[in-house]
């Protein structure tokens, strides 16, 4: 894959692409534990960590039972998690890459699924709030692989080539492949939220290229 920097709009997924979503989850758990401590005087952080370690399917429901609270309180924990100020950062390498692309590429944008407020809080914490961001929660809940947000990016940056970088082959690459974009998958590790197994998927779902670090994009770029 060869990429012309000045003629390509770079579009990134957010979670498990620009940063590790597991870091956001850990940040949210800390925020809920802090809120519980302030309301009830009980330190539940170790309990929550134990639940996570043992793959508790209903973390906030389990917390209600642990605190002897009605299960209706579960929603308050969920919203505390969703609306907390995330303690997440970009790696220095990813900061430098995005700065380079913002300065020299034809365009730079983010396309991500999720709730508007939650995703915007993540972008702010990562220092990316100034970038054009196309969030499914702001577009009628049209999660990937719905093609409409990809088409909107093409309309915003017309007459260029487009590259989408994501991590989840189950949904990230089908639409841009169909729109004749270039697609690049970022291989993850055991901390990734979603599987990257592609053997069960039609090849139309596969990225055209795989990289192990975002910085490998620089090796694919032609000025």
What is the meaning of each model-derived region?
Residues 1-7, 102, 109, 115-223:
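Asp-based, Mg2+/Mn2+-dependent phosphohydrolase catalytic module
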Residues 51-54, 86-90, 141-142:
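Acidic-and-aromatic substrate-binding clefts and catalytic sites of carbohydrate-active enzymes
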Residues 35-38, 42, 49-83, 100:
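A metal-dependent, Asp-based hydrolase signature
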Residues 27, 31, 62, 96, ...:
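Alpha-helical elements of Rossmann-like donor-binding domains used by nucleotide-donor carbohydrate transfer enzymes
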Residues 82-109, 147:
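Short, acidic loop-to-helix structural element flanking the phosphoryl-transfer center
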Residues 1-45:
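Active-site neighborhood of HAD-like aspartate-dependent phosphohydrolases
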Residues 20, 110-111:
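Small/polar loops that bind or transfer phosphate-bearing groups
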